[in-house]
Amino acid sequence: MVGANIYNTHNIHDPNNLNNLNNINNPNNITNNMHNPHNIFQNNYFDPKQLKILVDNMTPQDLELLLTLSCKKGIIRDVEYILCRIMREMINININYGLCQAIENYHLKIVELLIDHGADINYNNGLPLNLAVKNGYYDIIELLIEKKVNTNDNIFQLLTHCCQNNLPNSLRILLKENISIDPIYSTMVNLCLDNGYAECASILINHNNSDSTINSESMIHDTNLTTSQTLLELDDLLELDDLLDGNDYFNYNQDESDVGDDAENDIENDIEDDN
């Protein structure tokens, strides 16, 4: 995991640092107790006074650690205060670890906050987007795309992941980039159909039909490709008709209020089916 080493308390190694357990003389002293690194890991929430003392006296290395842990736990107040000190004193730390932890643990507001404070959405070869797609967090995917995340390097891998794991909302948002899926179209559609993922298959077919219409002038010069696509789409539509069993996924429009993650929606659908 990226940045996993920062969770190791042994990284707090400076013997002159207040974090060193040997420097804690008075157990009743709030400052010393708070600088015990074990307290940082065990406490889920600091009161405002504790937080101020802790953050204002931390070294950059420990500040980075606390920021990352706060992002992981989703404690937005702590994240805001830490970022305030970082910006005020122009402290140079890596806030991208925190961004990845916030995405992995689905803390949308913290993701927005970190991006607004300069976190790199293309960090580590697109890890933020990869994490969002892996977990099916389509509102985070949408946020990253709105912020102009780079989707050029691994878009086909991301789309394939959506098809393999039946993530229709994530797939739909990624395809809003108006990309051509010709190189992997047949593979992805067949993958969806083989697994019974009708909605994902219909999204791909609709996108490809729309893309073919937009680029019809260029496709005239590629007769073989157009013919093979047409034959594939006819077969796909017949198979989809059996899968859908009368359900109209082709005219599906996502409700603007429908936010969350694909995995959560799948669970809700299963519950409804059981009832």
Curated annotation (Swiss-Prot):
Write down the Gene3D superfamilies for this protein, in alphabetical order: Ankyrin repeat-containing domain
Which keywords annotate this record?
Answer: ANK repeat, Repeat
Which InterPro entries does this entry report, sorted A to Z?
Ankyrin_rpt, Ankyrin_rpt-contain_sf, Multifunctional_ANK_Repeat
Does the keyword Hydrolase belong to this entry?
no
The source's domain of life comes to Viruses
UniProt xrefs under Pfam families: Ank_2
Note the segments forming the ANK repeats. Answer: 94-123, 124-153, 155-183, 184-213
Name the segments for region: Disordered: 253-275
PROSITE patterns reported for this sequence: ANK_REP_REGION, ANK_REPEAT
Keyword check for Repeat: yes
Renumbered to this chain, the Acidic residues biased-composition regions fall at 255-275
Spell out the protein name for this chain. Putative ankyrin repeat protein L715
